[in-house]
């Protein structure tokens, strides 16, 4: 077993705890109103969506370069590895979303509460979908304005979760790189961040637990492959001092 395999598996299982628990108890999303903790989750979810995901991506890249790159060539390879990981995950997301066409939880709730058929909702263009949400929900006290704004920006299909693919891929990659090199605190921090993103996607009515589970597993497989290749190609310089 490679040195990165065990920590990635453990981190994956930790990330799967919330969606598996939600799936087992049969929890169904319902509007929760205006709560500070829910708005905090909204800001956490923004770290893995446009435009803030670009800043997070740059932060992760900078961290990798500072920790592991001992030459310009090594830095370029590290950046290419992360780009390949994220682009592959997002490519899978686009392909599967357009194939399965699973409605988001909030769209299913909209159908039950306002009799807007999910099929009819998704027949509209994205701009028209946002207009439908505005028309029906602008006066609904159960939906905070920030949540409505978030929904209007994300009116696509649910399965799989692009936010989860982004957060889980980055966090698992860093765990695979950091944990074997005794960077335990950083490994825990990125895992907690990713878990926050996963929980936020369910709490905000954006994804079903099975979306989160599948996306996390896809990320884990991709990260395993990437870590195997980096070890095979000796991309990471183990002689660099990483002790904390």
Protein language model regions, located:
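Hydrophobic alpha-helical bundle signature of multipass membrane enzymes
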Residues: 2-155, 168-178, 188-190
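Membrane-embedded catalytic cores of phosphoryl/pyrophosphoryl-handling enzymes
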Residues: 2-4, 9, 129-244
């Amino acid at each position: 077993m490679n040195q990165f395999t065990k920590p990635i598996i453990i981190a994956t299982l930790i990330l799967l705890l919330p969606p598996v628990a939600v799936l087992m108890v049969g929890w169904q999303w319902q509007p929760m109103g205006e709560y500070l903790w829910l708005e905090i989750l909204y800001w956490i979810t923004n770290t893995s969506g446009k435009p803030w995901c670009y800043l997070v991506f740059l932060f992760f890249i900078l961290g990798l370069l500072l920790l592991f790159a001992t030459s310009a060539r090594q830095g370029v390879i590290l950046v290419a590895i992360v780009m390949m990981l994220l682009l592959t995950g997002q490519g899978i997301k686009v392909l599967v979303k357009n194939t399965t066409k699973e409605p988001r939880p909030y769209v299913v709730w909209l159908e039950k509460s306002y009799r807007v058929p999910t099929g009819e909702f998704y027949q509209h263009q994205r701009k028209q979908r946002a207009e439908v949400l505005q028309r029906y929900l602008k006066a609904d006290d159960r939906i905070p304005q920030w949540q409505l704004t978030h929904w209007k920006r994300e009116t696509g299909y649910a399965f799989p979760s692009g936010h989860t693919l982004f957060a889980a891929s980055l966090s698992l990659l860093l765990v695979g790189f950091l944990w074997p090199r005794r960077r335990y605190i950083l490994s825990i921090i990125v895992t907690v961040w990713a878990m926050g993103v996963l929980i936020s996607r369910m709490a905000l009515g954006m994804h079903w637990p099975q979306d989160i589970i599948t996306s996390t597993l896809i990320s884990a497989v991709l990260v395993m492959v990437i870590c195997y290749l980096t070890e095979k190609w000796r991309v990471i310089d183990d002689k660099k001092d990483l002790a904390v």
